[in-house]
Amino acid sequence: MPAPTNAKGVFTICPTPFDDALKVDTESIKSLVDFLLDTGITGLAILGFLGELHKLNNAERRLVTDTFIQHTKGRVPVWVGVRAHGITGAIEQAQEAQDSGAAAVFAAPLDNASDALLFDYYKAVAGSVKIPVVIHDFPDSFGTEIRPEVVARLGKEGGVNMIKMEEPPVGQKISRIRDLAGDEAMKIFGGLGGMFFLEELQRGAVGTMTGFAYPEVLVEIYNRFAAGDHKGAAAVFDRYCPLIRYEFQPKIGLALRKYIYQQRGAIRSNAIRSPGMRIDALTIKELEATVARVGLSTTARGRQAVKA
């Protein structure tokens, strides 16, 4: 059964870098790790929906996992995504991640599963490993709703004590889960690109797991809020909201983020595998204008100054 965790803060969901021939680019994985650690994040989360896990074969999945974990060298925890069509496959992926040195796994639900099946699924995955298992609750992408009652039961009876919660209205669901489970049985991370990060913290979330490509902004919001400077956290959130909103666009969010990371020098190519929508020249122009409007740069290397 997984050990308890005190995880909190900003966990960046990482893209999987490919070269221009669409092969996994391990050198860009290493440079991305170094870049992200410089922004002050708490941890890395790999092979999530943003990481194009569903577009990798098994050998590539293991290569990506091993490269991220080995290059991170324990400087921050690395959480690994699990997504399978059945319990057996999910257990295999979770155990492989554990063997590679993952600090936790975050598991997508089974397709269109009942409450009973979801409970059995997550409990089985948790029972197969000694590292924490995180529920990935994103019904808009996975097509499966995980009700607060199921989440609470998993926290109390299933050995699963964390959730990446991405079902709007996020505030109401966070409060409902906390009411049913309590803060010790279920720790809640937000997501959805950081669009509701301030409200998630106000409702009791312990952090966020998202792929926003300026993670130093989220780190500043979290640090101010955790220090009791709630007005300062709100001021930072309000300043950068236009960029958070623009970057988290359905269908092109991955392409926008890979473009930003390439421009910032974190990865060598912004290539994405099919299926996946690319961005046109006008979209790039809009993005760069939005970045400039909030006082950031798409080309400056390394951590950028974040202001209220």
Annotate the PLM regions.
Residues L63, T67-T72, E96, S100, ...:
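Alpha-helical structural signal in soluble globular domains
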Residues T12, I46, G51-H54, A84, ...:
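Short, flexible micro-motifs
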Residues E199-A308:
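Structured C-terminal cap/extension of enzyme domains
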Residues A3-E145, Y261:
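Active-site beta->alpha loop and helix N-cap motifs at the rims of alpha/beta catalytic domains
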Residues V76-P77, V133, M162, A185, ...:
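Secondary-structure boundary/capping signal
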Residues P139-C241, R245-Q249:
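Catalytic alpha/beta core domains of metabolic enzymes, predominantly
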Residues G51, G86, N112-A113, D140-S141, ...:
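Positions that flank functional sites
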Residues D25-S28, L32, E60, V64, ...:
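General structural feature for long, well-ordered alpha-helical segments within catalytic domains
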